[in-house]
Amino acid sequence: MRIQRTPAPPKAPRALLCVHGAGCSPAIFRVQLSKLRAALREDFEFVYATAPFPSAPGPGILPTFEGLGPYYTWFEGSPSGAAAKGDNSNSNDSNSSPTVHDRLAAVHEPVRRAIAEWQTQNPSIPIVGTVSFSEGALVTALLLWQQQMGRIPWLPVMQVAMFICCWYQHEATQYMREEVGCGGDGGIDGEKLVIRGVLSLHLQGRDDFALAGSKMVVAQHFVPGEAQVLEFAGRHHFPNRPRDVLETVKRFRQLCVRARVIG
């Protein structure tokens, strides 16, 4: 007797690049995004990049994901672990930590590899946007800015982006200023620090230790007409209350329609 195999479900027509937080992993991020993935499963596939450096578990990982390592971080020598204790915007020990430029150079390879592997295996399913969390959200913002400046042509054109509880360092803004020659006060070239052409949704937990920094990222580096902020009752995590999840999906879908990513 011949056993019939159940056909694999058809893949969605487009994909989102997922960038996990510090002290996390693609496998854990997949679980963290389970409600979002379920809601968007007919519209998007999810492509996961793995951070380059082994690390201890990050903020909010324990006890839920205890023993489910290895865990990875994007920035070697990153103070994002210290940020969990409240210092989320001012860490400038440049003598002991790599520069933002050096950190981004290390980030490029694993992100580029994840994208290339996806494009090779799924040439008809383009990556059109991103979903990122915490340190990964800061990484994503910097990558989008680098792409805008013509530095990383290998990154697909991102039309939509979801930033979840974005972690922030002043070093990131200072790096941008130095790259465009603005100097310390930004001057007339301060407009070059703004990410344009990407419709974005910024999720911010009202009790998140990174809330102040997340607000700063939106205020300094995104266009008001292109960026939406959605606050939710929670801390440093993807929204978990049903009404917050529904509102997140609703807002993101609206951005996707506006960007003509979905009909």
From Swiss-Prot:
Induction remark: Expression is controlled by the monacolin K cluster transcription regulator mokH.
Enzyme Commission number(s): 3.1.2.31
One matching Pfam family: FSH1
UniProt keyword terms in alphabetical order: Hydrolase
Pathway(s) it belongs to: Polyketide biosynthesis; lovastatin biosynthesis
GO cellular component: cytoplasm; nucleus
Superkingdom as given in the UniProt entry: Eukaryota
Biotechnology: Monacoline K acts as an inhibitor of HMG-CoA reductase involved in cholesterogenesis. Its hypocholesterolemic activity might be useful for lowering cholesterol levels in the blood and reduce artherosclerosis and coronary heart disease.
Reaction(s) the record says it catalyses: dihydromonacolin L-[lovastatin nonaketide synthase] + H2O = holo-[lovastatin nonaketide synthase] + dihydromonacolin L carboxylate + H(+)
Catalytic residues (positions): 134, 208, 236
An individual GO BP term: secondary metabolite biosynthetic process
Molecular function as annotated in GO: hydrolase activity
Purpose: Esterase; part of the gene cluster that mediates the biosynthesis of monakolin K, also known as lovastatin, and which acts as a potent competitive inhibitor of HMG-CoA reductase. Monakolin K biosynthesis is performed in two stages. The first stage is catalyzed by the nonaketide synthase mokA, which belongs to type I polyketide synthases and catalyzes the iterative nine-step formation of the polyketide.
Family: Belongs to the LovG family.
UniProt protein name: Esterase mokD
Species per Swiss-Prot/TrEMBL record: Monascus pilosus (Red mold)
